[in-house]
Amino acid sequence: MRKSIFIVSILASFVLFFSCTADITLTEQKDGSVKVLFSGRAGDEFNKLINGNNEGSLIDVKQISYQLEKAGFYDVKVTNDGIKDVKISMLDKSKSSYIFTSGIVSSKMDLNINKENLRKFYDEADEQTRLILDLLIAPIFNGEEMSADEYVELLSSVYGSAVAEEVQKGFVNISLVNSSGKKSSVKIPVADLLCGNAEITF
């Protein structure tokens, strides 16, 4: 049995951690549900950008849990391992959550990053999330067409080279594991993701 999994907003949900490195693993369970594991770390410069000189965390564990449960996930567990680190595990049992839709064909898992749905996530996000995402001035959320290099240059002109370099060096690592244990992985540059230039299927 094949499960086609379309990521529509999970990447946007966690984009505030992506100025460094984030890892997302999607594992198809024997019962057809999908287990999602996420770990991410906010970059130092981006953390300063959001929090200013405050030493507090930009991670609201209760709010993240609430939003994910509201999106249709089960068994949501969010842990905050410091000011900038977060780990999340959750389960999509219904196969009809806001994040995923599923289809049956043969025996592998597919991934598609869809920028239209990322924009939809932004439009439907709560005010606090939108304010954070607005700080990224990301083309994916404002509808502008821009290359990754142009976007990094824009960040540099607005926030300085340190923030721009942090985003430029950031990657999102995504792994899919089907019910037979076969694993596929892809590494996506953060700048490409935020420009909407990462519509990848594998």
List PLM regions with ranges.
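Positively charged n-region of N-terminal signal peptides that target proteins for export
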Residues: M1-S4
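Residue-level signal for mature regions of secreted extracellular proteins and peptides
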Residues: I10-S13
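C-terminal motif of bacterial Sec signal peptides marking the signal peptidase cleavage site
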Residues: L16-S19
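Bacterial signal peptide processing site
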Residues: T21-D23
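Post-signal peptide N-terminal segment of mature Sec-exported envelope proteins
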Residues: E28-E45
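Short, hydrophobic/aromatic beta-strand segments
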Residues: V36-S39, K48-G52, Y98-T101
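Post-signal-peptide N-terminal segment of Sec-exported extracytoplasmic proteins
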Residues: R41-A71
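Mature, soluble, non-transmembrane domains
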Residues: G72-F202
